[in-house]
Amino acid sequence: MMQLLQLLLGLLGPGGYLFLLGDCQEVTTLTVKYQVSEEVPSGTVIGKLSQELGREERRRQAGAAFQVLQLPQALPIQVDSEEGLLSTGRRLDREQLCRQWDPCLVSFDVLATGDLALIHVEIQVLDINDHQPRFPKGEQELEISESASLRTRIPLDRALDPDTGPNTLHTYTLSPSEHFALDVIVGPDETKHAELIVVKELDREIHSFFDLVLTAYDNGNPPKSGTSLVKVNVLDSNDNSPAFAESSLALEIQEDAAPGTLLIKLTATDPDQGPNGEVEFFLSKHMPPEVLDTFSIDAKTGQVILRRPLDYEKNPAYEVDVQARDLGPNPIPAHCKVLIKVLDVNDNIPSIHVTWASQPSLVSEALPKDSFIALVMADDLDSGHNGLVHCWLSQELGHFRLKRTNGNTYMLLTNATLDREQWPKYTLTLLAQDQGLQPLSAKKQLSIQISDINDNAPVFEKSRYEVSTRENNLPSLHLITIKAHDADLGINGKVSYRIQDSPVAHLVAIDSNTGEVTAQRSLNYEEMAGFEFQVIAEDSGQPMLASSVSVWVSLLDANDNAPEVVQPVLSDGKASLSVLVNASTGHLLVPIETPNGLGPAGTDTPPLATHSSRPFLLTTIVARDADSGANGEPLYSIRSGNEAHLFILNPHTGQLFVNVTNASSLIGSEWELEIVVEDQGSPPLQTRALLRVMFVTSVDHLRDSARKPGALSMSMLTVICLAVLLGIFGLILALFMSICRTEKKDNRAYNCREAESTYRQQPKRPQKHIQKADIHLVPVLRGQAGEPCEVGQSHKDVDKEAMMEAGWDPCLQAPFHLTPTLYRTLRNQGNQGAPAESREVLQDTVNLLFNHPRQRNASRENLNLPEPQPATGQPRSRPLKVAGSPTGRLAGDQGSEEAPQRPPASSATLRRQRHLNGKVSPEKESGPRQILRSLVRLSVAAFAERNPVEELTVDSPPVQQISQLLSLLHQGQFQPKPNHRGNKYLAKPGGSRSAIPDTDGPSARAGGQTDPEQEEGPLDPEEDLSVKQLLEEELSSLLDPSTGLALDRLSAPDPAWMARLSLPLTTNYRDNVISPDAAATEEPRTFQTFGKAEAPELSPTGTRLASTFVSEMSSLLEMLLEQRSSMPVEAASEALRRLSVCGRTLSLDLATSAASGMKVQGDPGGKTGTEGKSRGSSSSSRCL
């Protein structure tokens, strides 16, 4: 912007240069804008005008000055005359400068005499949050009847905030109240006021008044607020209150309305009779005093009357709050808002102010057109069109004009070059008129004196010069002479010439004194047909005046370019053309052009089209000529080679025809034609070309094309590419199918090492090696009829036989978990209020169920199988722990030593033996069967205790719940199923292929290998029994001693039941693998020892799985018994007595058979023994 301003200050254009010789100057207008916050300290710098104009150093040297043409008196701004420094002279208050306008803009003009610029300065005064919202009164008093309906609205005083923008009034809040709420209403003029709303019925007897705090907030940073106390007095109820026809009204009034003018008549009705129905009107006392002084209302008629004249410039709008109330006691006033908008009236005459750029009325004739003379400001206090002023000049010659800059400000400019010799003085009339309906105008006389100066610039004889010359001229050729005249005298009239810089300025030159223009070099029409340049004429005056003119030079073409053949393509001035002839018919076919002059080109066979018409078009010769007009129009002719007149050449189009119908006789012949292309210039230029035409048959052409190597056609390339792509796709598809088939085949068998390799390739899991020790063999857990406890063991040692002879039965070593709560419940029920006979029977039953000589039992966290220990003598009894601890240790003599434990010699898997009779003798009943019967007894006892009045049935919910856990005891096989993330052992149906090798005693193969034919043997169909059938047989066998318990008929394992086990899990997945009858070993197990190392001896009794199921049953019974711990024990004693009799009948009374190994001593109430104490057969045994 500054550079453009400087350029404009240096040049005027076609009229000449700007200059400053007198008091008046030509000025370029410039608008600058500044911002300043209000309340800044005095002397704050706002801006610097010299920086806006640039070239400060030059201005200092030239003594530049800044002159304020107009400065509003209300704006305390100081302008430095040397550098144009703008600063505040005193305190700035935006509310005083622009009370009702936002943004607040204050403008004035400054003339920079040394820079030839008129600067229009606009200063925006920014508002700061220096005022807080204020209410007209700090306390408002309202009256409302207690019978006021809900949603009744009461207007409140409006807060005033003189700030603008975000600093002005933003919202209202009301102190918490359950009877009143606040609603903020935004008016048409964006004003905000609050209304009090009744949200809960009022009761004067409860609350006769309310004190509420109304707070008004602005949106400044930080926000400011103002408060007002609102006192609401609750009056006795009045049946009805007046009602306005409309709650809010808006009207307009001219500002020139006379006092006493009726503005509006309000009406309100009250349905009451008498004084309660008479309505009177009054203005709200909460309105500003200015409103109360300007308007009044008749109390009886409701007429709103103007009291004093209005002035739109002071207040353009008023808001009047009118209330109406009846004359009854405790009236409820009704409210109506009346918005009065004042319409501006053209009642102000424009005023004219003239500020001269220099000393008054003296203007130099040196000023060019559009030079600044003075600043004219027209002002009108009206608004809108009434305040828009239009100014114009009344003059005879029209040498001056007015130009609007902004608003009502004009510049007086020169409209022509002034000439003192002709008009030494001008008298102008300045008129100003507003744009109102009834416009008002003003006028002012201006007298201007003209001073003499060098005011004439050189003037050319023509406004534009044109000249023509032929190309290929000689250097220094005279083109034209330019003439300019200057009306000034002396050196001011001496003119010099020069050519303005341009891209073509180097082609010509001009004599600075005579104006003769010459060519500097030879010109070429083909490069440019013409060019234009500017010639500037300057006088010698001070300042120098100049003018310019445009000169156009057009070139005439000369025939200096010969035609050039572009088709067919020539090689060394030669081209060949092969014409195909059908040997049988003699018809001509489509010819083939050869640009190399050696014969047919290309290997593609062209599409053949027979032409039997006469003459036949062979080709079209095309030539180009760079010249224009007749110099560029070629003519074609055959100079030689066409003596037989076989060929015809069109001289204008260049089409070559063969004049023959049957071309059979021409096969094998060659013709050389000399073609001449000549333009029509003077003198003409020509080009020669040799065209060889050969007539060949189509068969010979195809044979020749096949012999010669060439590029494949596009169609052939496409076919080859498609074939290659299809072949590649077929190979990829075959390879993919082969890989998929191989993977499918490999997935049919499990390979430990492949699983380990696959597991190692898992990217998201830490690699874990699968070793032989991670795969455990799970034997079949089933008690078979007629099968002793030593089935599946290949070796018997002498120590075990000695223990059997001493009365130790390994079948009884199965660990049985009894929770403390269940033990205490059974014992306490036998001692609380039961007769001696019942206690004796209960004690016998307890002995029968729990007092078995047992190995130290493993907890749920450590499920290790017990090892048998030989009985070295008669064990001595050892007292049990007290009643609070159900578990105790049975120990022998102090000198007895614990028998050493050693693992069995074989690791053969147990295999269930089938029996034909399907019966089990009570004398040879195995350990799991006795455990099962003990569980049934506990189940029946718990059921009888919980439901003593109900009858025992198979379909009872508790029995069904217990039967589900009992069925788990019969669940059979488990097999390892390796997973890439660890081994997950799932139950496998009995009819499926077993992953555990079966062995038949000593015939088991070494390393756990078995015969494949034995792996897929089906089980007995009798095994497919439901849980309900199994439970019915067990209960019937228990209550009927003559019937045995068919334990060999097992149900198929169900993985759903396996999922119900709440086995304790550890972080090491290897500890969670169930391996019944497998003794703990410290020997390392790897893949190298897989199937070779000897496994510990397996035992069909006392398995860890059975112990876990018994623990589950114990927990179930504990929950059942705890729910009815206060139940009388008569029913339980009777049930236990029956169970004891059935047990003795079935030879299950283990208390007698184990008398040699353990004795229970009870001395309730001071008898022979102490309750809860017992003696075991080994120091490592545990009594549950």
Swiss-Prot record:
Residues 740-1184 are cytoplasmic. Expressed in highly vascularized tissues including the heart and placenta, but most tissues contain a low level of expression. Prominent expression in the spleen. Present in villous and extravillous trophoblast (at protein level). Glycans are attached at residues 415, 582, 659, 662. Residues 1012-1023 have a biased composition (Acidic residues). The modification Phosphoserine is found at residues 859, 1062. InterPro entries: Cadherin-like_dom, Cadherin-like_sf, Cadherin_CS, Cadherin_N, Protocadherin/Cadherin-CA. Changing residue 332 to N: In DMJDS1; uncertain significance. The chain crosses the membrane at residues 719-739. It is linked to Diencephalic-mesencephalic junction dysplasia syndrome 1: An autosomal recessive syndrome characterized by severe global developmental delay with profound intellectual disability, spasticity or dystonia, and congenital microcephaly. Brain imaging shows hypothalamic midbrain dysplasia, diencephalic-mesencephalic dysplasia, and intracerebral calcifications. This is Protocadherin-12. It comes from Homo sapiens (Human). The gene is PCDH12.
